C-alpha cells in the first residue's frame, strides 16, 4: 500500500495495472542534468575533481612548454564565478546565461645555464577564460535570450570494427572483409582484402598500401611478419633424396597425398585418398613423429625464413619464396639440414600475408616510412626525420591520437583481451621497443609483448579464414551516446588547443621579457568556440516549448545526425530500422515521419547511460525461477549473455514463475524457455517505449504506425485556457508534469502562510531547517503570462490555500497543460462515431457550437514584436508619436513617447510604436515645393517606418519593454517602466523581508514564552514572559529582554543576528537589482533604442484547425454546428464531436474505441458521485462506493487504494474533485481488459455495449442503429488556420525578376505555376492567361498603367513585356550570344 501525499489525495487515478511498480519512473531529465553537472564539477573541491569535463580538458592541454623548453605554463585549478544576470533577466535582455570561468595557472621559467633544469622563478595567477554557459535546473541553456536544448548524439563508438562489403565491390560477389580502428580523435586506420586476397591498409580513407608496408614501418622484417601470422612446418632434407616432415597430424586434414601414408607395414591412408578426421585420430594414436615424403611434396611450398649457405654466407633463398627443384638441390649441395615452410591451405589457412609481401615494393623500414609519407603528403619531398615524425604523430602521440577509455575497452574486448584499460594511443612492442625515449620505455614496461595492430590483422585474417564473425554496426553495443557535457568538453578542448598554439609562441618572449600568465593567454578562441557550439551547432536546438511533454521529449531526444554523425542522404535503411538491442533503451515507436525517420529517437522510460556512454536498461534478477526485486542495469553488450523474461510473465504470490515455458528474449531472438533457465525479467511493461508513447492509453491495441503519429502529435498540442486531466490516462502523467519543470513543487515541507496569484510563501517545518542563518521561509514566485518559444502562453496558477500543510515535492502551482500536477494536453470531449451529412468525410471533424461557447479549445498565443531605432547615414531614427501623414485616429493608442499603451486592443495594420527615419533630399515636385514654402522644412525630411501589427493578427498589448543604449537619454516611457520595475522589486524584497522577520519572531516567541527574566523591557527580575506581554511589546524591544535561562538568551541573540543579516542581504540584493534596472542596455552595434511589444492573441477553434486524439487519429475541423442540430442522447445531452467511423478499421487504432468506452464509464461514475454529494449521502456510503470503484477486483493487489488513510474531510474533497469524472489509468501493455471496461460501464449504470441510441438534432428522429458514444481526450494541435491563411493584394516584388515574393512571411503571392498555365491553355482562356503572365506577375509598366486606369475608372489593360523575359535575354547575352528584339 502506498501512502499518499497532500497533492495525490486531491484526486486519485484508478489504476488497472496488474504489475506492481518495482522501479519508480526515474528523473526524466537526468541525461542532460547529470552530464552537464559532471562537465562543470562546480561544487566539487578542486583537489577531488575527477578526470571529466573542464578539468580533463585543461589537464590534457596543459602544461604548455615553450619551443626551447625553458618556460612552461602549468594548470593548477579553476573556479566558476557568479552569473551577472539571473535566468529571468537573461531572457528579458536577450543575454546568455553563464558564469565566468577563472583558471589558475602557474608560469615556471627554468634557468638556461643550469644543466639540471633548475627553476629560475615561478608566478601563479588567475586567468579569465571566457563565459561558460550554465544549465537551468530544467536542463536547458539560455543563449541570446532564447531557451535552447543540446540534443544527445548517438554515434559510432570508438574501437575496432570488422565488416564485409556484402559482395558489392567485385562482380563475382565475393565477400571482401575489412577492419577499421576508429579513435575518439585522430586518424582512422583501415585494413581490407582485395579480390585477389592480398591485404591492404588505408590511413584516413586515402590511397591503399599493402599492409606489409605498415608493419615494415613499425620495424618488422619479412621473417618476423611471417612468423606472426603462420604456423611453420619443418622439413629435414636427406642428403641424397627425399625429405622428412616433422609430423603434426592435425595439419594434414583435408589433404590428398600422392603416396601411401603408413605406420610401419599398416597403411593408414592410401595414395590419392583425402585425409579425414578419422585418419587424423589414427595418426595421433600411432605416435608417428616424422614422415618421409618425396621431393615433389616440398616443391612449391613457401619458405618461412631466409636460407643461407653456412660456409660461404651466400643467400640461397629468401623468406616467402616458393621452393623450386633447383633451390632444393642447392640446399642439399650446401648441406642445409632443415627448412621451415608456411602451413597454408585453401580451406582455412589462406596465404594472405604471403601474397601481400609479393606485391610490396619496399625492402627496409625507411622505404616503408617514405612510402607512407608520400601517400599522406603527396608532392612534398620526404626526408628521414619528416617521414618518422609523420608516422609517429599519426597513431602514437596523445596530442594527435586518442582512443579514449571507451575505445580502449571496446578494442581490447574485440581482440579477445582480458583487461579493459590501457593506453589511449596504439601500442606496438616492436615499434616502442626500438625507441629510446622515457615514454616508450614506460609503455614497454607496462604492456610488454602485446601489439594492437598485429592483433587486429590476426582477428581479420581469422574472420577471412572462416573463424569469427563480423560486427553489426547498428547494435547498441557499438553505438554510444554523447551527451551535453561530453560535447561541451570537446569544444572546450578545441578552443584550448587554439590557445596553446598562441601561448607557445609567446612563451619564448616570456623567458626574456618577464610576461605574466594573463598577458600570455588570450581567452578569445575558447570563448568563440563555446559560443559557436551553443549558438549554432546542429545539435544545439531551439527548444520545442509547445507544452510540457514537448519540452521533456526534446531533452530526451537522441540523434544520429550532427557533427561526427550520419547525414540524412547517406543513412541507409539498416541504420534507421528497429534493432533488437533497442528494447528498453531507445523507443521503438517514437521517431519523426519524413526524411529523419529512425535517425532521431527518444530514450525509453527507464533507460540511462553508463560510464562509457552506452545505453542501459534495468532488469529484475531471477534465480531458479524465483523473481527478486533486486534491479540490475545491463548494457546491450552485457545483455547478450542472458535469457530475459517479459514483465508480464505469470508469477504466483511468492514471485515464482509458474508457466512451464516462459516467453523470453535471448541474443535478439524470441523463444520459450523453462523458468530455471531465465536470468532476468523486465521491470515494467512500458520498458520498451518512450515517455510520449507511454502516455497513449491502450497503446497495445494500436497499429505501430498510428501509435507513432499519436506519440508525435501529443507534442504539438497547444495548452488550452483551462487544462483538463485526461479521464483515461496511463498513470505516468504525474511524472511528466513533475519533471518538465512547468509546475511549482515544494522544495521543503511546511505550512502555506501567504498566497496570491504571483507568489506562494511557505513556513518550513522545523525538521527541514538547516543552519543558524536559515529563516525557515520558502518563497515561490510564479511565472505569469510569459511567451514560450512557440508563442504559446506560460502561466502558473496556485493550487493551495493558506493553512494547507504540505510535504516536500507536493505541487503548489499548476503550469500550462497541467491539472493538479498531472499532464493535461487537451480536453475530454463527448464523442460519437457516426457519419453526419458528409461533414466528416476523409477524417474531417464536426464540432458542436457549445465547444466554442465554453472556450474549451480557446488558446492564448503571445506574439513578440520588436521595433529597432538605428543610427543611419542620414542621421538617427527616432521613436516618437510625431509621424508625418498619419491621422490622429491612428495614433490614439500611443503615449507621448510613441509607444502603445498596455491593455490596448489592436488590429492588423495598427501602429504599435511610432518611428521616423530621416530620408535623403529628393527632387521635389512643384506641389511639394509649394507645400514646403507654406509649411516650412520639417514636413518632408523624414519618412514613416513605424512598427505596425502584421496582417492577420489582432490582440491585446500585455507588456512593453524599452531598451536604451548606454549614454543615450531615456524617454518618458522608459523611465516609467524603470520606476515601476524598481517599485515592484522593492515591494517584493520588503514583503520577503517582512515574512522572514515574522517567521523569526514567531520562532523566538515559542522559545521564550513561559521563561523567567532577569529584567529589561520594563520587567522585574523573576517575572515570567506571557503571550499577552509579548503582544503589547514593540518588536524592537524584544531584544532588550535579559533572560535567566542560558538557552533563551542565546535564542534572542541568534534572532537579532538573523534579522540583521537578512536586512543587510536584502539591501545588497536590492541595490544590485536596482543597478541592473537603471543601467543602459547592451544593444547590437548601431542600435540606439529597442522596443518590444507583447501581444496576447486569443484563438478560438474554427474550421481549418487541426485536431487529434492520442492514437494518431488526426483530422481537420470541417464545420461548427449549432447545438440544437447535433445528435443527442435520450437524456437530452448533445455530443461535442462527431467522428467518422470509417477512420478506425483501416487504420487499426482500436485503442481509441476502448478509450471512448472507458472514458464514458469514468464520466458516468463521476456523475453518480455528484448525485450522492447533492443528495448529501452519508460519508460511509460514499466511502463504500469509492471503495467499490477503486478496489473491487481482489486479484489486483498491486494497485489497491487504501481509503482508510483519508479523513472524512479529505474524502469529501477527493469526491468533489471526482464529480467531473473518475480518472482512470490503463498502463501501456498492462491496461484494462474488456471485462474490466464492461464492469466499469455497469457500475456507472451505462450500457455495457458502450453504445446508445442517438437522435437527430434537426428532425428529432432516432437513428437506425445504436452508436458508439463516450469521452475521448482530444487535443488541438499547433497547426492553426489563422497562422496559415494568407492573402495578398499588392505587396513586395523580387528585385531581379520583378515577380511577387512567395510565402506568408514575406506577404507574398500565390504562384501560378506550370500546371496551372497548362490548365488555362487547355481551356483556351488566352486573355486570362495573358493577364496572369504579364500584369499580375512581372510586367512593371503594365501593372503601373493598370493601376492608373483603375483609378481613372477605365477598365482595360495593356500587356507589355514581362521582366523575366528581359532577364532571360540578359542571361543569353552573358553567354556572348547577342539577341535583339525587332519592332514588328
From Swiss-Prot:
Enzyme class: transferase
Catalytic activity: RNA(n) + a ribonucleoside 5'-triphosphate = RNA(n+1) + diphosphate
Source taxon at top rank: Bacteria
EC number: 2.7.7.6
A cellular component annotation (GO) from this entry: DNA-directed RNA polymerase complex
Keywords recorded for this protein, A-Z: DNA-directed RNA polymerase, Nucleotidyltransferase, Transcription, Transferase
InterPro entries: DNA-dir_RNA_pol_bsu_external_1, DNA-dir_RNA_pol_su2, DNA-dir_RNAP_su2_dom, DNA-dir_RNAP_su2_hyb_sf, RNA_pol_bsu_bac, RNA_pol_bsu_CS, RNA_pol_bsu_protrusion, RNA_pol_Rpb2_2
A Pfam family the protein falls into: RNA_pol_Rpb2_1
GO MF term set: DNA binding; DNA-directed RNA polymerase activity; ribonucleoside binding
Protein's GO biological process: DNA-templated transcription
Record's function text: DNA-dependent RNA polymerase catalyzes the transcription of DNA into RNA using the four ribonucleoside triphosphates as substrates.
Record's subunit section: The RNAP catalytic core consists of 2 alpha, 1 beta, 1 beta' and 1 omega subunit. When a sigma factor is associated with the core the holoenzyme is formed, which can initiate transcription.
PANTHER family: DNA-DIRECTED RNA POLYMERASE I SUBUNIT 2
Family: Belongs to the RNA polymerase beta chain family.
Protein name: DNA-directed RNA polymerase subunit beta
Organism: Stenotrophomonas maltophilia (strain R551-3)
Amino acid at each position: 500500500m502506498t501512502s499518499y501525499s497532500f497533492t495525490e489525495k486531491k484526486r486519485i487515478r484508478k489504476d488497472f495495472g496488474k504489475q506492481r511498480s518495482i522501479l519508480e519512473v526515474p528523473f526524466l531529465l537526468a541525461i542532460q542534468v547529470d552530464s552537464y553537472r559532471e562537465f562543470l564539477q562546480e561544487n566539487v573541491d578542486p583537489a577531488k575533481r575527477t578526470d571529466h569535463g573542464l578539468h580533463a580538458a585543461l589537464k590534457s592541454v596543459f602544461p604548455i612548454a615553450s619551443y626551447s623548453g625553458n618556460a612552461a605554463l602549468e594548470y593548477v585549478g579553476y573556479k566558476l564565478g557568479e552569473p551577472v544576470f539571473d535566468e529571468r533577466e537573461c531572457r528579458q535582455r536577450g543575454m546568455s546565461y553563464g558564469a565566468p570561468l577563472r583558471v589558475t595557472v602557474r608560469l615556471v621559467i627554468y634557468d638556461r645555464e643550469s644543466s639540471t633544469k633548475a627553476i629560475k622563478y615561478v608566478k601563479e595567477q588567475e586567468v579569465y577564460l571566457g563565459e561558460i554557459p550554465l544549465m537551468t535546473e530544467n536542463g536547458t541553456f539560455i543563449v541570446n535570450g532564447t531557451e535552447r536544448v543540446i540534443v544527445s548524439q548517438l554515434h559510432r563508438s570508438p574501437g575496432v570494427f570488422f565488416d564485409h562489403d556484402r559482395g558489392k565491390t567485385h562482380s563475382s560477389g565475393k565477400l571482401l572483409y575489412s577492419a577499421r580502428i576508429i579513435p575518439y580523435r585522430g586518424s582512422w586506420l583501415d585494413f581490407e582484402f582485395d579480390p585477389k586476397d592480398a591485404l591492404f591498409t588505408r590511413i584516413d580513407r586515402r590511397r591503399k598500401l599493402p599492409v606489409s608496408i605498415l608493419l615494415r614501418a613499425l620495424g618488422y622484417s619479412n621473417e618476423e611478419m611471417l612468423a606472426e601470422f603462420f604456423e611453420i612446418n619443418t622439413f629435414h632434407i636427406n642428403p641424397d633424396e627425399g625429405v622428412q616432415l616433422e609430423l603434426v597430424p592435425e595439419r594434414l586434414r583435408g589433404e590428398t597425398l600422392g603416396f601411401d601414408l603408413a605406420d610401419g607395414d599398416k597403411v593408414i591412408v592410401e595414395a590419392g585418398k583425402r585425409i579425414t578426421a578419422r585418419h587424423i585420430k589414427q595418426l595421433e594414436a600411432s605416435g608417428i613423429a616424422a614422415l618421409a615424403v618425396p621431393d615433389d611434396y616440398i616443391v612449391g611450398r613457401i619458405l618461412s625464413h631466409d636460407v643461407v649457405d653456412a660456409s660461404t654466407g651466400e643467400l640461397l633463398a629468401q623468406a616467402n619464396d616458393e621452393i623450386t627443384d633447383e633451390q632444393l638441390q642447392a640446399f642439399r649441395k650446401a648441406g642445409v639440414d632443415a627448412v621451415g615452410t608456411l602451413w597454408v591451405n585453401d580451406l582455412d589457412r589462406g596465404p594472405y600475408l604471403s601474397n601481400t609481401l609479393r606485391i610490396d615494393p619496399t625492402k627496409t623500414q625507411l622505404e616503408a616510412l617514405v612510402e607512407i609519407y608520400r601517400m599522406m603528403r603527396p608532392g612534398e619531398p620526404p626526408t628521414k626525420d619528416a617521414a618518422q615524425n609523420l608516422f609517429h604523430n599519426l597513431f602514437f602521440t596523445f596530442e594527435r591520437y586518442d582512443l579514449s577509455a571507451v575505445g580502449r575497452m571496446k578494442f581490447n574486448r574485440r581482440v579477445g583481451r582480458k583487461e579493459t584499460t590501457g593506453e589511449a594511443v596504439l601500442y606496438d612492442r616492436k615499434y616502442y621497443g626500438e625507441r629510446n625515449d622515457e615514454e616508450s620505455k614506460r609503455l614497454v614496461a607496462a604492456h610488454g609483448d602485446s601489439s594492437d595492430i598485429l592483433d587486429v590483422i590476426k582477428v581479420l585474417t581469422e574472420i577471412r579464414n572462416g573463424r569469427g564473425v563480423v560486427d553489426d554496426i547498428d547494435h547498441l553495443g557499438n553505438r554510444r551516446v554523447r551527451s551535453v557535457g561530453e560535447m561541451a568538453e570537446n569544444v572546450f578542448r578545441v578552443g584550448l588547443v587554439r590557445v596553446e598554439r598562441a601561448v607557445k609562441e609567446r612563451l619564448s618572449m616570456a623567458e626574456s621579457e618577464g610576461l605574466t600568465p594573463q598577458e600570455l593567454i588570450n581567452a578569445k578562441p575558447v570563448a568563440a568556440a563555446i559560443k559557436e557550439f551553443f549558438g549554432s551547432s546542429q545539435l544545439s536546438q531551439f527548444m520545442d516549448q509547445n507544452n510540457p511533454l514537448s519540452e521533456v521529449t526534446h531533452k530526451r531526444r537522441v540523434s544520429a545526425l550532427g557533427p561526427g554523425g550520419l547525414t540524412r542522404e547517406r543513412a541507409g535503411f539498416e541504420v534507421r530500422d528497429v534493432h533488437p538491442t533497442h528494447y528498453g533503451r531507445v523507443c521503438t515507436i517514437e521517431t519523426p515521419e519524413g526524411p529523419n525517420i529512425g535517425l532521431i529517437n527518444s530514450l525509453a522510460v527507464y533507460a540511462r547511460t553508463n560510464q562509457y556512454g552506452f545505453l542501459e536498461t534495468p532488469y529484475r534478477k531471477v534465480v531458479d525461477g524465483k523473481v527478486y526485486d533486486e534491479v540490475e542495469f545491463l548494457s546491450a553488450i552485457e545483455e547478450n549473455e542472458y535469457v530475459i523474461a517479459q514483465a508480464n510473465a505469470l508469477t504466483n504470490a511468492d514471485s515464482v514463475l509458474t508457466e512451464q515455458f516462459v516467453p523470453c528474449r535471448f541474443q535478439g531472438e524470441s523463444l520459450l524457455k523453462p523458468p530455471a533457465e531465465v536470468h532476468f525479467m523486465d521491470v515494467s511493461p512500458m520498458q520498451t517505449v518512450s515517455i510520449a508513447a507511454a502516455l497513449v492509453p491502450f497503446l497495445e491495441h494500436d497499429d505501430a504506425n498510428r501509435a507513432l503519429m499519436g506519440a508525435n502529435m501529443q507534442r504539438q498540442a497547444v495548452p488550452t485556457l483551462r487544462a483538463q486531466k485526461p479521464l483515461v490516462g496511463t498513470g505516468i502523467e504525474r511524472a511528466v508534469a513533475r519533471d518538465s519543470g512547468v509546475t511549482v513543487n515544494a522544495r521543503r515541507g511546511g505550512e502555506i502562510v501567504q498566497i496570491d496569484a504571483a507568489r506562494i510563501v511557505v513556513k518550513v517545518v522545523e525538521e527541514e531547517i538547516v543552519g543558524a542563518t536559515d529563516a525557515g521561509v520558502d518563497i515561490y514566485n510564479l511565472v505569469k503570462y510569459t511567451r514560450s518559444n512557440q508563442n504559446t502562453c506560460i502561466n502558473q496558477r496556485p493550487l493551495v490555500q493558506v493553512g494547507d500543510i504540505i510535504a516536500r515535492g507536493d505541487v503548489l502551482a499548476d503550469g500550462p497543460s497541467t491539472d493538479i500536477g498531472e499532464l493535461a494536453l487537451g480536453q475530454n470531449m463527448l464523442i460519437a462515431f457516426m457519419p453526419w451529412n458528409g461533414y466528416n468525410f476523409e477524417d474531417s471533424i464536426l464540432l458542436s457550437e457549445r465547444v466554442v461557447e465554453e472556450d474549451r479549445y480557446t488558446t492564448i498565443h503571445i506574439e513578440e514584436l520588436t521595433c529597432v531605432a538605428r543610427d543611419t547615414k542620414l542621421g538617427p531614427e527616432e521613436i516618437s508619436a510625431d509621424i508625418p501623414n498619419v491621422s490622429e485616429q491612428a495614433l490614439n493608442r500611443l503615449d507621448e513617447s510613441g509607444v502603445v499603451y498596455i491593455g490596448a486592443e489592436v488590429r492588423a495594420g495598427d501602429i504599435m510604436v511610432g518611428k521616423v527615419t530621416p530620408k535623403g533630399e529628393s527632387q521635389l515636385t512643384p506641389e511639394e515645393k509649394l507645400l514646403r514654402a507654406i509649411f516650412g522644412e520639417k514636413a518632408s525630411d523624414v519618412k514613416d517606418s513605424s512598427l505596425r501589427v502584421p496582417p492577420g493578427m489582432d490582440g491585446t498589448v500585455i507588456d512593453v519593454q524599452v531598451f536604451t543604449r548606454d549614454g543615450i537619454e531615456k524617454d518618458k516611457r522608459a523611465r516609467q517602466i524603470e520606476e515601476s520595475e524598481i517599485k515592484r522589486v522593492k515591494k517584493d524584497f520588503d514583503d520577503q523581508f517582512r515574512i522572514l522577520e515574522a517567521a523569526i519572531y514567531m520562532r523566538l516567541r515559542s522559545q521564550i514564552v513561559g521563561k523567567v527574566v532577569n529584567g529589561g523591557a520594563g520587567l522585574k527580575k523573576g517575572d515570567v514572559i506571557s503571550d499577552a506581554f509579548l503582544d503589547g511589546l514593540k518588536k524592537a524591544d524584544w531584544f532588550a529582554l535579559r533572560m535567566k535561562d542560558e538557552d533563551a538568551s542565546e535564542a534572542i541573540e541568534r534572532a537579532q543576528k538573523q534579522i540583521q543579516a537578512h536586512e543587510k542581504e536584502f539591501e545588497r540584493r536590492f541595490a544590485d537589482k536596482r543597478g541592473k534596472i537603471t543601467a543602459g542596455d547592451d544593444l547590437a552595434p548601431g542600435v540606439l533604442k529597442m522596443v518590444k511589444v507583447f501581444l496576447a492573441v486569443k484563438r478560438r477553434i474554427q474550421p481549418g484547425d487541426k485536431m487529434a486524439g492520442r492514437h494518431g487519429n488526426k483530422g481537420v475541423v470541417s464545420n461548427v454546428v449549432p447545438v440544437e442540430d447535433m445528435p443527442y442522447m435520450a437524456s437530452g445531452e448533445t455530443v461535442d464531436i462527431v467522428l467518422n467511423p470509417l477512420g478506425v478499421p483501416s487504420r487499426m487504432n482500436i485503442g481509441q474505441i476502448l478509450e471512448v468506452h472507458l472514458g464514458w464509464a469514468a464520466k458516468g461514475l463521476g456523475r453518480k458521485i455528484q448525485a450522492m454529494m447533492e443528495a448529501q449521502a452519508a460519508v460511509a456510503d460514499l466511502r463504500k462506493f469509492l471503495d467499490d470503484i477503486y478496489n473491487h477486483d481482489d486479484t489486483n493487489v498491486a494497485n489497491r487504494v487504501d481509503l482508510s488513510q483519508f479523513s472524512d474531510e479529505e474524502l469529501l474533497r477527493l469526491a468533489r474533485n471526482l464529480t467531473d469524472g473518475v480518472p482512470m489509468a490503463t498502463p501501456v501493455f498492462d491496461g484494462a481488459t474488456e471485462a474490466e471496461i464492461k464492469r466499469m460501464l455497469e457500475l456507472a449504470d451505462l450500457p455495457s455495449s458502450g453504445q446508445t441510441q442517438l437522435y437527430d438534432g434537426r428532425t428529432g428522429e432516432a437513428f437506425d442503429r445504436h452508436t458508439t458514444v463516450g469521452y475521448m481526450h482530444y487535443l488541438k494541435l499547433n497547426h492553426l488556420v489563422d497562422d496559415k491563411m494568407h492573402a495578398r493584394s499588392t505587396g513586395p516584388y523580387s528585385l531581379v525578376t520583378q515577380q511577387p515574393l512567395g510565402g506568408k512571411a514575406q506577404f507574398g503571392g500565390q504562384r501560378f505555376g506550370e500546371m496551372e498555365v497548362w490548365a488555362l491553355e487547355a481551356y483556351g482562356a488566352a486573355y486570362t492567361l495573358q493577364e496572369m503572365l504579364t500584369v499580375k506577375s512581372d510586367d512593371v509598366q503594365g501593372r503601373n498603367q493598370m493601376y492608373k486606369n483603375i483609378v481613372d475608372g477605365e477598365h482595360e489593360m495593356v500587356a507589355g513585356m514581362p521582366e523575366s523575359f528581359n532577364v532571360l535575354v540578359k542571361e543569353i547575352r552573358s553567354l556572348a550570344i547577342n539577341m535583339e528584339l525587332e519592332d514588328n
